[in-house]
């Protein structure tokens, strides 16, 4: 078996494909959606997907580029008066870009329960899929203000974990690899659900792409 055909190489290749964050020049850029704007109906309406992708996600990538440019200028001029601002901007905007990239790949599934090694890992770490779902729904719904619910894998601990993220970058745990992210910023659901966040979060499980989540777990373990 050649190095390019090992399970590890294949997992890393998959990770690169569904997590492309930059264009050929190295600038942060948004990849094309893996589905049409109406593909998530009736769970998420076409207008929300359009606005979310074209105006919110793309704005995070553009702002991350501006933050990088600001830091580069600071280094070139040895003027770090605005370093705190640009570091905070980069953490927020780049995290938003990364999480949205994962979010789109997590959707457009059939909503069936996880299978195979992913299901075994869920059972080992949470007791059952239903217990994981209960915790993830509750944690995501309870995020204070804007943020995310995350199912992640910690390679050092070798376990799955559920986390809340406020904004895009707060309350995470170092080393966690996001596998499934649920967006509860209001722009993700307000046109259709208004203040009914619990309904939106529950409905997301009808369209989760668990095969993609399983691929992410394979890549994280490689």
Language model feature labels by segment:
Residues 32, 53, 164:
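Pocket-edge structural micro-motifs
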Residues 211-212, 216, 220-222:
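Low-complexity, Gly/Ser/Thr/Pro-rich intrinsically disordered linker/tail segments
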Residues 8-9, 105-114, 192-197:
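Short helix-capping/linker segments at secondary-structure and domain boundaries
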């Amino acid at each position: 078996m050649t190095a390019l055909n090992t399970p590890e190489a294949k997992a890393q290749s998959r990770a690169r494909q569904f997590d492309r964050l930059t264009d050929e020049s190295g600038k942060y850029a948004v990849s094309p959606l893996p589905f049409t704007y109406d593909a998530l109906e009736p769970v998420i309406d076409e207008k929300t997907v359009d606005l979310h992708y074209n105006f919110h996600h793309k704005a995070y990538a553009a702002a991350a580029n501006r933050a990088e440019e600001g830091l580069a200028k600071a280094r070139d001029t040895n003027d770090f008066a605005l370093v705190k601002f640009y570091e905070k901007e980069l953490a927020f905007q780049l995290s938003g870009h990364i999480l949205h990239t994962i979010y789109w790949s997590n959707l457009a599934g059939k909503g069936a329960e996880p299978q195979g090694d992913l299901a075994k890992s869920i059972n080992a770490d949470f007791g059952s899929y239903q217990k994981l779902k209960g915790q993830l729904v509750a944690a995501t719904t309870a995020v204070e203000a804007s943020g995310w619910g995350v199912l992640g894998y910690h390679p050092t601990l070798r376990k799955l974990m559920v986390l809340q993220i406020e904004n895009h970058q707060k309350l995470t745990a170092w080393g966690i690899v996001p596998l499934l992210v649920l967006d509860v910023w209001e722009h993700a659901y307000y046109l259709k659900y208004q203040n009914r966040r619990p309904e939106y979060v529950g409905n997301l499980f009808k369209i989760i792409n668990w095969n993609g989540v399983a691929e992410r777990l394979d890549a994280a373990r490689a």
